[in-house]
A protein has these predicted regions:
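Internal acidic/polar
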Residues: 67, 75-105, 127, 167
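A short, charge-rich alpha-helical start-of-domain segment used by transcription regulators
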Residues: 1-17, 27-30, 41
Length: 168
C-alpha cells in the first residue's frame, strides 16, 4: 500500500476523536473527518513524507472547522455532547460517570480557543509546538491559552459546571 495512505489511515482515529470534541455531534464529526481526508487527498502533492503528518492533517481539519464555523455563525453555539460510555471496555462507576459528565460540561463552557488547545494537548497528546503549527499561532500563545483554559476549567469544576451540580 502507498505510504501516504498508511499515514492517513494511522491518524483517522485521532482525527475522529478531535472532530467529535470540536463539533459535539457524531454526524458532523464524521463529515468533518471526511472533508479533512478529501482535502488531504486533493493536496497530496503538498504532503512531505519526512514532515509531521499529524500536524498537517490537524491543521487541515482546524481550518475546515474554522471556515464552517464562520459560515454557520447564525446557528446556536452549543450542542449537547453524546455519551460515549458504550465504547468503554468496562462501564465506569456512577461516580466516575458523573465526574466525566461534569468535566465534559465544564470543557464546553471554555472559549473555543482555550478548548481547542486543551483538547490537542490533553486528548491528542500533541506538543506545544505541534499545537502551534496546527492552529497557526505562536507557541507562547499556546502556553498562555492552555494555562488560562486549565485555570478556568479548574474554577468551573470547583463551582460545578452549569446543569450538572450534584444534589446530596
Amino acid at each position: 500500500m502507498d505510504l501516504f495512505f498508511d499515514h492517513l489511515e494511522r491518524w483517522i482515529p485521532n482525527l475522529r476523536r478531535y472532530a467529535r470534541a470540536l463539533t459535539r455531534d457524531r454526524e458532523q464529526a464524521d463529515d468533518l473527518v471526511q472533508d479533512c481526508l478529501e482535502r488531504a487527498l486533493s493536496r497530496r502533492h503538498l504532503w512531505n513524507e519526512d514532515g509531521n503528518t499529524r500536524a498537517w492533517l490537524f491543521t487541515i481539519m482546524h481550518n475546515i472547522h474554522a471556515n464552517d464555523t464562520r459560515r454557520n455563525s447564525s446557528r446556536p453555539a452549543t450542542v449537547p455532547i453524546e455519551d460515549d460510555a458504550g465504547h468503554h471496555a468496562r462501564p465506569p462507576s456512577q461516580t466516575h460517570r458523573v465526574a466525566g459528565l461534569e468535566a465534559a460540561a465544564a470543557l464546553q463552557e471554555l472559549p473555543d480557543e482555550q478548548r481547542q488547545v486543551i483538547l490537542l494537548v490533553a486528548l491528542e497528546g500533541m506538543s506545544y509546538g505541534e499545537v502551534a503549527e496546527t492552529l497557526g499561532i505562536a507557541q507562547g500563545t499556546v502556553m498562555s491559552r492552555l494555562s488560562r483554559g486549565r485555570e478556568r476549567l479548574r474554577r468551573l469544576m470547583e463551582d460545578g459546571a452549569p446543569g450538572l451540580r450534584i444534589v446530596k
